[in-house]
Curated annotation (Swiss-Prot):
GO terms for cellular component: cytoplasm; ribonucleoprotein complex; ribosome. This protein binds to 23S rRNA in the presence of protein L20. Pfam families: Ribosomal_L21p. It comes from the Bacteria. It comes from Marinobacter nauticus (strain ATCC 700491 / DSM 11845 / VT8) (Marinobacter aquaeolei). GO terms for molecular function: rRNA binding; structural constituent of ribosome. Part of the 50S ribosomal subunit. Contacts protein L20. Keywords: Ribonucleoprotein, Ribosomal protein, RNA-binding, rRNA-binding. Belongs to the bacterial ribosomal protein bL21 family. GO terms for biological process: translation. This is Large ribosomal subunit protein bL21.
């Protein structure tokens, strides 16, 4: 059984017992979170597609940890002008473990 959920403006295909990194959620480590924006639920050949969401479907997850991704370096460079600007960015994430899919 799997589902497609929306979190942080992105769509994720999830299965029960799977861990994934989402955009940062304001939930403490060890807490639980429910995703009610479920776009698709599939159980074998039984597939429910929402328009836009599946009514009554929800995915529950447990927050495992918070952290930051690897650094992304941004460089702006003007050729022949002796001008270069460097900037780095590390995006926050929340790692969750999917505990249940209903729907």
């Amino acid at each position: 059984m799997y589902a497609v959920i929306v979190s942080g403006g992105k769509q994720h295909r999830v299965k029960e017992g799977e861990t994934l990194k989402l955009e940062k959620l304001e939930v403490e480590t060890g807490g639980s979170v429910e995703f009610d924006r479920v776009l698709l639920v599939a159980n074998g050949d039984d597939v429910k597609v929402g328009a836009p969401v599946v009514e009554g479907a929800k995915v529950t997850a447990e927050v495992v940890s918070h952290g930051r991704h690897d650094k992304v370096n941004i460089i702006k460079f003007r050729r022949r002008k002796h001008h270069m600007k460097r900037q780095g960015h590390r995006q926050w994430f929340t790692e969750v473990k999917i505990t249940g899919i209903q729907g």
